[in-house]
């Protein structure tokens, strides 16, 4: 994988709260390398707002969204619950988000459900 794409963090989510999240497939336009990242921000009212924000942060990459949902994050209890879907992008494979979240939050109890909105 290219050094450039490795500089993009795999996971960036807000602290305690419920918020929308998306999975983003990032592709380095020069090398063709790809990777999946997770972003979730309470400040974004729509899933596409998250994608728009990420697009402005990194140049030389293309971004596609395989889907989104919501995350319920409790820092005090060290729990993350990934669930639901995005009306704009559909429902992703939440297990892929959980894999990435477990790398960033190894001491957390992280679960997911395909139910809910």
For each predicted feature, which ranges?
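Intrinsic low-complexity, intrinsically disordered or marginally ordered coil/linker segments
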Residues: 1-117
